[in-house]
UniProtKB/Swiss-Prot annotation:
SUPFAM superfamilies: GAF domain-like, Winged helix' DNA-binding domain. GO terms for biological process: negative regulation of DNA-templated transcription. Negative regulator of class I heat shock genes (grpE-dnaK-dnaJ and groELS operons). Prevents heat-shock induction of these operons. This is Heat-inducible transcription repressor HrcA. InterPro entries: GAF-like_dom_sf, HrcA, HrcA_C, WH-like_DNA-bd_sf, WH_DNA-bd_sf, WHTH_transcript_rep_HrcA_IDD. The keyword Repressor applies. Keywords: Repressor, Stress response, Transcription, Transcription regulation. PANTHER family: HEAT-INDUCIBLE TRANSCRIPTION REPRESSOR HRCA. It comes from Trichormus variabilis (strain ATCC 29413 / PCC 7937) (Anabaena variabilis). GO terms for molecular function: DNA binding.
Amino acid sequence: MQVQLTNRQQHILWATVRHYIATAEPVGSKALVEEYDLGVSSATIRNVMGVLEKSGLLYQPHTSAGRVPSDSGYRIYVDQLITPSLRDTTRTEVLAKEVESALQQHLQWEDWSLEILLQGAAQILASLSGCISLITMPQTNTASVRHLQLVQIETGRIMLILVTDSYETHSKLMDLPPARSETKPDPEVIDRELQIVSNFLNSHLRGRSLLEISTLDWSQLDREFQSYGEFLKNSVAELAHRSAAPAATQIMVRGLAEVLRQPEFSQLQQVKTIIQLLEEEQEQLWRLIFEEPELEDTHKSKVTVRIGAENPLEPIRTCSLISSTYRRGGVPLGSVGVLGPTRLDYESAIAVVAAAADYLSEAFS
């Protein structure tokens, strides 16, 4: 979400979010004057908060109450306000070191095993973030690519078909790349182009793990077909990861008791739906947290933050999910994440998730 805020609006939104995260109480201008050195009067803060409310970044839960951040307000906070000028970098660095130190200490006193490593990581992640921690088991025996084919279904519409080594078939329907559909090319020309791109995919991916698809170097595709490469890159990776979910998706879950003490989870029915998701619908959750973000450097962990209604799974549309992928040799093996109320400490959660993903990547390398 791109919203242009003045420096004053940024600082007041930042202070409002930080105060609400800390107190779970609607925030008024008086509290901000007392707690933060914003350099403006209470009346000015009220006016700015009114502007932020009209922009959809804050709202009043009750007429007489202060204001709280909306999902959009949290999104601006995460994307634009957690920057070196506003972020407590020392604090996040300390948290990252705590994760690494705690994991090293945990392994020092235990006989090293995969289960012990991941259980320890899940518990440490929950303790440091105050959230539910989620860690997927590494996918070491995934299916591989047998064949990929692009087929023209009708004018302007194509289908990507993936066949695995076990002959499972997966498909994705999509429009032609805009650069090709705008010129209204002859269908026979499109068929030939799709076959050339299909040949490229098969020559580079046949026999490789589905999880390796994200490492494909699309720059090797002939220049005249680069419009397909740019368009298909995410679609091919998305289809592969959607197909890679194992029959038994195991997710280690820790920290449930702690996070359910938060006021946001006071409704019993909401708690039940979250527990049901964690216990009975792990495949849906696995697919969500194992979605692969586009990375420039596949050896570094990128943290994905989904806030409130950005989550496609209904039971957690009032929660925030922060996740990252751990890898071996640049190939994704599994994911780590934390789940909590939208009113969570994003800086801490992002720091510990990134640190845990990096540590596990090193452990598996």
